[in-house]
Amino acid sequence: MKDNNAFNEMMVHLPLCTHKEASNVLIIGANNEDMKAQAAKHNKVSNIEFGDTSLLTSKNEKNIDVVILTDVKIDELLLANIERILKEDGLITFTSKAFSRDEDQLFADLKLVGTKFWIAMPFKFGHNTSIIASKRYHPTADINLQRADLLDDLNYYSAEIHNASFVFPASEHKALTGIAKR
């Protein structure tokens, strides 16, 4: 299994199995056919659009449920654009740095989104670390198990992996306390 299989599955299924009913989803940044295939597994419920950051400025206010940033670095301006279009129960997922490689960047990303979101939690899979930030739904307490368990043809993602990806070693968990909003 390639690391990008895990990336595509986790970046798509984790947020879409956390949100109660994501009808409008934007996937911003680089994507490939496998990313699109993973997203297509949610087409019965979700309208999914792919594009670059200019897609954010073309959307109406408070109209998007989920924004997934595949390789786009989040900053205050981008977050303001996302905040403008995200619904009151919306969430975002984006890549960050691993705790062991650049904890300062991980902390900075968590603090940035923590100002706008009720929940801001890092999750790990393969050699990747990403963050989910949510205005309402908790990624482990509100996982839609039926949706997660009914996804077919997966190599990495499962409901169990979904929950396990939020578990960090004790020292990292302690260091994240007060920064990550769990």
What does each model-found stretch correspond to?
Residues M1-N43:
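Class I S-adenosylmethionine
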Residues N128-R182:
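SAM/dcSAM-binding transferase cores
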Residues E103-F125, A133:
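Conserved Class I S-adenosyl-L-methionine
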Residues L26, D65-T70, T93:
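Structural motif
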Residues S46-S58:
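A short, well-structured beta->alpha microelement
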Residues E76-L91, L110:
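A short glycine-rich, Lys/Arg-flanked "PGG" loop and its adjoining helix->strand segment in the class I
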